[in-house]
C-alpha cells in the first residue's frame, strides 16, 4: 500500500489546487481553492478561456462579482470530479468587515445554488481567521452556510473558531514552519525540527488534541505543507489539504506510515478549556508574533492576487 492510500485510512485527503484536471489522478475526497491558486490556474492556456468567458458573459457587472462567478465556475468544475466538498474563498480585502464578508459569502452560495449545487453538503465558504472573519462565520453558520476558517496560525484563533461553531479550520503548517526557520536563521536545525518536532506540526497537534478533548465538533484540516514529512507527522488529522506535487510524492512511496494523531487518545487530555472575548482574542493574537505577522502577510498576499485577477479581467475585456 502506498502512503497516500495508507493516509486515507485515518484522514480525509483534500487536494489544494485550482488545476481541476489533476484531480482525477489523486482522487481526493474534497478540494480547496484560494485566489492565488485560481490566479495561477488562469495563467495556464488550458484555463484562460474560463476567465475570458466570465468576463464576456458578465460584461458590465462589477469586477468583484465577475471574480466570484469565476471562482464558482472553477468550483463547479471541481465538484463534477470529486465526491465531496469544495472550499471557495471570500475576497481577502473584506477580512476586517464582518457584514461585507457575510454578504459576499451569501452571494457565493447563491451562485452555486444557481448551478444546482447542494451547498449545505458540498460547499465551504473560506474566510480569514480575523476576529471579524470569525464573527462573520458564526453568522453564516447560523444561516446554514458551512465555513472554512483559513489563515489560521495560532491556538487563540482555533479556540475562537471552535466557540463560533465553524465547520472547519485550516491551520497553516508550512507557513508556521517558514516563520520559525527564517527567525532562527543560521541557528535553525532542520533535523531537530522535522516530523513531530516541526513547529507547524506541533501547532496542529495542539489544536487537534484540544478540540477532541473538549468535544469541539469543528473539523481540523492541516494546510500549507512544505514537505511530505509534515504530512506524515499529521496522519490521523481529520483532513489534510495537499498540493498535487506532494500527493504524487506520497503515492510514489511504499514506506510504512504511522498513525500519528489519534482522536480517541486525545479525548483523555487535561488541558483546561479556554475562551476569549474580542479584547482577549486580540491581545492573545498580538502576543504571538508569528501568528500576527503571518496572518497580516497572508491577507496582503491574497488581496494582491485578487487585484492581479481583476487586472487580468480588465485586459481580457478590452
UniProtKB/Swiss-Prot annotation:
<dbReference type="InterPro" id="IPR004730">
    <property type="entry name" value="Transaldolase_1"/>
</dbReference>
<dbReference type="InterPro" id="IPR001585">
    <property type="entry name" value="TAL/FSA"/>
</dbReference>
<dbReference type="GO" id="GO:0005737">
    <property type="term" value="C:cytoplasm"/>
</dbReference>
<dbReference type="InterPro" id="IPR013785">
    <property type="entry name" value="Aldolase_TIM"/>
</dbReference>
<feature type="active site" description="Schiff-base intermediate with substrate">
    <location>
        <position position="126"/>
    </location>
</feature>
<keyword id="KW-0570">Pentose shunt</keyword>
<keyword id="KW-0704">Schiff base</keyword>
<keyword id="KW-0963">Cytoplasm</keyword>
<comment type="similarity">
    <text>Belongs to the transaldolase family. Type 1 subfamily.</text>
</comment>
<dbReference type="Pfam" id="PF00923">
    <property type="entry name" value="TAL_FSA"/>
</dbReference>
<dbReference type="GO" id="GO:0004801">
    <property type="term" value="F:transaldolase activity"/>
</dbReference>
<comment type="function">
    <text>Transaldolase is important for the balance of metabolites in the pentose-phosphate pathway.</text>
</comment>
<comment type="subunit">
    <text>Homodimer.</text>
</comment>
<dbReference type="GO" id="GO:0009052">
    <property type="term" value="P:pentose-phosphate shunt, non-oxidative branch"/>
</dbReference>
<dbReference type="GO" id="GO:0005975">
    <property type="term" value="P:carbohydrate metabolic process"/>
</dbReference>
<comment type="pathway">
    <text>Carbohydrate degradation; pentose phosphate pathway; D-glyceraldehyde 3-phosphate and beta-D-fructose 6-phosphate from D-ribose 5-phosphate and D-xylulose 5-phosphate (non-oxidative stage): step 2/3.</text>
</comment>
<dbReference type="InterPro" id="IPR018225">
    <property type="entry name" value="Transaldolase_AS"/>
</dbReference>
<keyword id="KW-0808">Transferase</keyword>
<protein>
    <recommendedName>
        <fullName>Transaldolase</fullName>
        <ecNumber>2.2.1.2</ecNumber>
    </recommendedName>
</protein>
